[in-house]
Amino acid sequence: MPKRQDIHKILVIGSGPIIIGQAAEFDYSGTQACLALREEGYEVVLVNSNPATIMTDTEIADRVYIEPLTVEFVSQILRKELPDAILPTIGGQIGLNLAMKLSNTGILDELGIELLGTKLTAIDQAEDRELFKNLMQKLHEPVPESAIANNIEEAQQFADKIGFPVIIRPAFTMGGTGGGIANNEKELAEIAENGLNLSPVTQVLVERSIAGYKEVEFEVMRDAADSAIVVCNMENFDPVGVHTGDSMVFAPTQTLTDKEVQMLRDAALKIIRALKIEGGCNVQFALDRNSFKYYVIEVNPRVSRSSALASKATGYPIAKMAAKIAVGLHLDEIKNPVTKKTWAEFEPALDYVVTKLPRFPFDKFENGDRTLGTQMKATGEVMAIGRTLEESLLKAVRSLEVGLIHPERPAFAKLSDDELSKQIIQANDERLFYLAEAFRRDYTIEEVAELSKMNPFFLDKIKHIVELERELAAHKADLGLLAEVKRYGFADEEIAKLWGLHADQVRQMRKEQKILPVYKMVDTCAGEFASDTPYYYSTYESSTESVKSDKPSVLVIGSGPIRIGQGVEFDYATVHSVKAIQKAGYEAIIMNSNPETVSTDFSIADKLYFEPLTLEDVLNVIDLEQPEGVIVQFGGQTAINLAEPLANRGIKILGTSVEDLNRAEDRDLFDQVIKSLKLPQPEGGTATDKAGALAVADKIGYPVLVRPSYVLGGRAMEIVHDATELDNYIDRAVSVSHDHPVLIDHYLVGKECEVDCISDGDTVVLPGIMEHIERAGIHSGDSMAVYPPQTFSQDIIDQITDATIKLSRTLNCIGLMNVQFIIHAGKAYVIEVNPRASRTVPFLSKVTNIKLAQVATLAILGLSLKEQGFETGLLPNQSGIHVKSPVFSFSKLNHVDSLLGPEMKSTGEVMGSDTTLAKALYKAFEAAGMHLPQFGRALITVKDADKAEATALAKRFREVGYQLVATSGTAKAFEKTGITVSTIEKLDSGQETILEDIANRKIQLVINTMSADKKVSSDGFRIREAAIEHGVPLMTSLDTAGAILKVLELQAFSISPIKS
């Protein structure tokens, strides 16, 4: 059937900010879908709240709205735009839930708007746990014994009937949010309460636990003519019980027989047909290891994390195809854009093994609960491709960027056998490394399988890697063995370690012996048809499929997996850099390892290498491609860390030179730059040991800000108030950055701001200045930022502009540079310079309408800023007021303190724009999911230093209609100024009233600035944890509370009696 002619304008709903469970895969799928619809001639209107995405660029849709994804705002857009249809299936769970809510309000019927792709009845049947169970029973597809519960009592009754353990799955949530495995009544009550709170329909499914079964996923597509295909099947390394987003995943399935694959394939196709899904869908199965018994776990009736992985694993662009199916095209009418010869109805075939590894945030949250279960905890993921499972797995481990090039944590060698066994039994984020350690101690496969409940096939592969390590250690410089271990994915650095050499010597040895990688193409058809996709992976075989072109090329290093501190913002900059390289007439080559992102879409660069971002892997690509140079400034710290080792090996780094990068990153060199320019800077110093650190702090006076050098996202950065705290900090955190000293600065209290500038070595352009709402001491990535600044005098703006231009010129910056300032006593103090793209580049690009990364790339490639139409200085402010607000994922992680400080904790961002600051703030809070009640009870408990300021805020909260509750010290301060307040006992008095009131929704807002006691048992920590667990808005900064008051005051009308 040809595409539909009766619809012309389509509204696409994006997926909002990046949170755990919903990451960059939706930027990738959303971008693909919008472009596919435009390709077919439709007018596309996009709404999304996340400015850090390619999807929200003006070229992606005909009109782009960066607005909160709420019924209130999207309804406004629907009334204004009057689209014919909505495509809700590519915005993740957020998009689906919003479509359901809009439908329930009646606005879609009122305006005659239809939903494309998957119908609401299908979404309901797949997402509503009871309807899904009924459908499966009708199809005779087995599901685990289960019951629907709408309250805790119902959940307990069913658990008593079938016995523990049970799995709890909330309805209409994503990433397993609110779910878990309960082993007893206490755990059941906790998980069920949380799940009911987080489910938008207050419903959970309680089911018999089938933990231990194999978990298998099928990615399927169907069109309106009922043609259906399997795009990819995948098998989880972890058995059922660990969320698939937190499990290692292999594609295609590795341990299933043909009969099992066909059985599950038939079931998946039967389910997608019964649901009448038009587009992509993900079906998850649990398969018994010892029989042909299986259960259907769940169905996602939309584009998902797994479909992004399947797209990159096979080269088959699922979201693009789903969008075309949604407008009526059939699979046999759509060309496969990879081969450009076959049709989309051909099922992809793989002649390689793909491994996906999750990337967890526990390097940021040392106290976090690392146990893995049905609720997802990973922030991102990496993918690697190899010809053997071992090669694919080892490449994935190097891609993770957790300081390892091989599955070996040296510290684990010190564990006792009991401790090691305990870690293997319990699924956690480092289980792979514990399993490898067990084989190094000669545990048998049977012993490890018994402890871990893992499939012996996978354990055998890990054991094989350990056996090869032993072979290497026993046969130093054996060239035959060298060729063999390279085929199994061993890194030069690991071989060098076992042979007592330097990695460069192993590399040299390989080159002399012609043991070199070749590059194979990902072509969707296992080489059956000729393909011209420029999408490659390395392996050690004989023939290569990647041929260097005659055109001069530039290599851009991507930013690797998404993690806290290095998010999708850097992928955004990478993609824009590629566009500019192509505009300048060069061939653009990308190297990256992240399957979720737009940069690894095969249609973006002229060539894509899906490879780990390590020195060895990058040098291998450079050897083949011989680029004019390498651009590192858009890939975050991942790429910057490669600059020096590449330059040392004679590779040309384009943009700011390595020497100048070092002058900005090395503390002593940077101090010299600041002194030579006579710029104000907080007093500080460096130390390489504890005694030196204590001496520096003593000299400059407490409080001090301490951090290691060369880090991103404020890793291991803290504000320290006395010598004891400093002593503790050095014992805990200083090993974070080997070879680099600790930096210690006097901590100034003041307004913070930052600026991104572009320079060509002469002209320096400042597109805009962003003022932070939270004062200095909270990481810039966790602060709300406002453009243009609202409270700075012209004198301060001039100081910032002047200092930025001087710094840029002195550091010989070519490309982008980010500078952060504290405004203290009328002076702009420089606190940090980052000579690269920062995480504010997308936000600033959107609000100033200047594509910063493209302008910077053209400058790097030699097109001066004057030729691009720019002069030195700060550009005039654009219209409107724009607020960038951080978004956190604390509700997904247990035992993680939400108190904000100098170490970054947010996973994503949203933007609110309007004509006044209060309105822009309101939109930013709504977009970030912080829905503020206009009245209620506010619990305020603050440290002594904040009491005066908190009193002024408390008065304003009373005026807008809030009742106040405070702990005794804070309450006394309020009562002194005549504020009405109820006193509540502190937790250490043995009373739990505070926590009970939060749990029972008797508190609508919590403001808590109690000290960052590292103890998880402290009062402040427990209050903050309770607020997050029960979804009560929580502020840990008085500045954020002040911003919220601006919004509440905007909404409140003044009421006062008439004067007598």
Swiss-Prot record:
Positions contributing to ATP 1 binding: 129, 169, 175-176, 208, 210, 215, 241-243, 284, 298
Binding site for Mg(2+) 1: 284, 298
Location of the region described as Carbamoyl phosphate synthetic domain in the Swiss-Prot/TrEMBL record: 547-929
Chain positions covered by the region annotation Allosteric domain: 930-1060
Chain sites annotated for binding Mn(2+) 3: 820, 832
Sequence segments annotated as region (Oligomerization domain): 402-546
Keyword match Amino-acid biosynthesis: yes
Cofactor requirements of the protein: Mg(2+); Mn(2+)
GO terms, biological process: 'de novo' UMP biosynthetic process; glutamine metabolic process; L-arginine biosynthetic process
Matches recorded under InterPro entries: ATP-grasp, ATP_grasp_subdomain_1, CarbamoylP_synth_lsu, CarbamoylP_synth_lsu_oligo, CarbamoylP_synth_lsu_oligo_sf, CbamoylP_synth_lsu-like_ATP-bd, CbamoylP_synth_lsu_CPSase_dom, MGS-like_dom
Keyword Amino-acid biosynthesis (UniProt): yes
Residues annotated to bind Mg(2+) 4: 832, 834
Binding positions for Mn(2+) 4 per the UniProt entry: 832, 834
Chain residue ranges for the region called Carboxyphosphate synthetic domain: 1-401
Domain notes: The large subunit is composed of 2 ATP-grasp domains that are involved in binding the 2 ATP molecules needed for carbamoyl phosphate synthesis. The N-terminal ATP-grasp domain (referred to as the carboxyphosphate synthetic component) catalyzes the ATP-dependent phosphorylation of hydrogencarbonate to carboxyphosphate and the subsequent nucleophilic attack by ammonia to form a carbamate intermediate.
NCBIfam families xref list: CPSaseII_lrg (TIGR01369), PRK05294.1 (NF003671), PRK12815.1 (NF009455)
Protein name according to UniProt: Carbamoyl phosphate synthase large chain
Lineage of the species this protein comes from: Bacteria, Bacillati, Bacillota, Bacilli, Lactobacillales
